[in-house]
Every structure is written in structure tokens, then in C-alpha cells.
């Protein structure tokens, strides 16, 4: 009678015979690593063995996080061990969130608040501030700037005929080296407005004396208070000096105010 041959089965068949189903999940910790072994069926209805390896690290967390980890589990996970369960929890990477105030976001997108696009520019030192707030106001730098502007305006008035444009008679006379029929040009008068109430004749003279010689000046004052009414008239001996004064002083900051300078209009207009 032939003997019965012993047929060796696979480890999966042996596990099925021993346990009558899937074996339980096991965990072992060695050399700072945690090994989790579990068994499950794949899509072909075959038993598979899955081994997950975790590296154990220690880190400092906020008190609220540490307290939350001590909470008791509930439901189907009531009997689970501390820490995440691979059956119900998927551990992903930490996501860092940054909360931004909406007002700060609006300010960041405001082009007017961009420091690289500063709209203020000083006429004296070319700094990023208004001319009225310039620390060099009234110093030698301010004086040199006014003198350069006066020379540039006078030079532009002399070079005007080269452009082919209309040349007033008074400029033609000045180019010829004379003042014309009259000894002076009475039309070289300007009106300076937006002056402060504390303005005096001495201040007015100090303001325009570096530009060119004047024939007369008039500072409008209130009859009752004697304070400046906010405007004044200055008559220069030459019209080119008056043009230079308009170019220099119009928009110039003086006594915390921005001056407005224009040609004086005749009284009959």
C-alpha cells in the first residue's frame, strides 16, 4: 500500500489553517523604529502581508496639542492604543497656515503706498519729501538752486528766437543790448498769492531779491488788522526776471504754504 505523500503548503495556507481567517495585527519596537504587521485580502481575494515601518521621534509641542492627545477615544476606536490607528487614520504632512489681516493685504496692494513710487519730490535736494519740509530750506543749497533756476530761465528767454516761435518786442530789445524806448519795462509785474498772514515787506523782499532787481513791491494788508491779505505784487525792472520769478516761485513752499505766482493782470481786464 503506497504511503501518503506529504504536500507542503504555502505560509498563507498555514496561517489560514491555524487561525481560521486573517491573523491579528502585531506591533514591535526595535532601535527607535515601530514595525506594524497586518494581513488583508487584495483585489484578487488573496491574503497579503503588509509591514509598515515608523520612525519614533520626540518633539516639543504646544500644551494644547499635548492635552488633546490625552483625550479618551470613543466609538469603534475606544479600545485602540494611543496614537493614530492605521486602519482609521492616515497621517499626512504638516500644513503651515499663515493668517493675514485683510487690511494689511489691501495696504500691500495699494500702489499709492508703494515706497518705490513716492509722489513727493523736493525741489531743493530732490529728496522724497515736499519742498516745504526740506531740512535744507533757506540754506546755501536753497540759494544756489534759486540762482540756477533764474539763470536757466533767463537763458531760455534769450534762446527763444532760435526755436522759430513768436518773440515779443521786449525780448528783441533785450537781445540787442537795450531796454527799448522806455528805460524800464513796466509790464514786468507778477502777482504772488497764497501768502501767510504773518508775511511782511521784508519777507517779500527776501523772497524775490535773489532773482533780479525790482522797481517796486506792494503787499496787500487788511485795513483793520494790518495782517497780510494773502497776496502781493512785485514789479521787476526786466521782464525776463519776472518770468524767472514765476518759474522759480510758482509751486514753491514758503512758510508751510505753496505759493501761486502768475503775471499781474491789468486793472481794466
From Swiss-Prot:
Keywords: Cytoplasm, Initiation factor, Protein biosynthesis, RNA-binding
Boundaries of every RRM domain copy: 188-266
A Gene Ontology BP annotation from the UniProt entry: formation of cytoplasmic translation initiation complex
GO MF annotations in UniProt: RNA binding; translation initiation factor activity
A Gene Ontology term for the protein's cellular component: eukaryotic translation initiation factor 3 complex
Subcellular location: Cytoplasm
UniProt-listed CDD domains: eIF3G, RRM_eIF3G_like
Family named by the database record: Belongs to the eIF-3 subunit G family.
Function: RNA-binding component of the eukaryotic translation initiation factor 3 (eIF-3) complex, which is involved in protein synthesis of a specialized repertoire of mRNAs and, together with other initiation factors, stimulates binding of mRNA and methionyl-tRNAi to the 40S ribosome. The eIF-3 complex specifically targets and initiates translation of a subset of mRNAs involved in cell proliferation. This subunit can bind 18S rRNA.
Name of the featured protein: Eukaryotic translation initiation factor 3 subunit G-1
Name of the encoding gene: eIF3g1
